[in-house]
């Protein structure tokens, strides 16, 4: 029986602002990892409601509420907007 779900992130190719470094990945208001350009990461989480956002160069993306079911994967892409703010969107 599967008792976890997964939140997956993919960060595509870089623009000039992206070259400044890694995004911090925040799930449930805790920094759990970082993600570099052209990197993918997956995080096992308990089923239920979670809150996801990114931090980059002192800026924060909009917080997204994610409902994760057991055995399911919720996928997102991350990038920077042209003005440098991190952006998180469903894949």
Which residues does each predicted region cover?
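Short loop/turn and low-complexity linker motifs enriched in small/turn-promoting residues
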Residues: 1-91
């Amino acid at each position: 029986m599967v008792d976890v779900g997964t939140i997956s992130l993919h960060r595509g190719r870089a623009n000039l602002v992206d070259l400044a470094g890694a995004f911090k990945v925040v799930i449930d208001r805790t920094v759990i990892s970082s993600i570099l350009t052209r990197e993918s990461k997956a995080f096992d989480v308990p089923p239920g409601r979670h809150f996801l956002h990114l931090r980059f160069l002192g800026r924060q993306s909009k917080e997204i509420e994610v409902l994760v079911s057991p055995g399911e994967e919720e996928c997102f892409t991350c990038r920077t907007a042209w003005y440098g703010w991190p952006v998180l969107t469903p894949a």
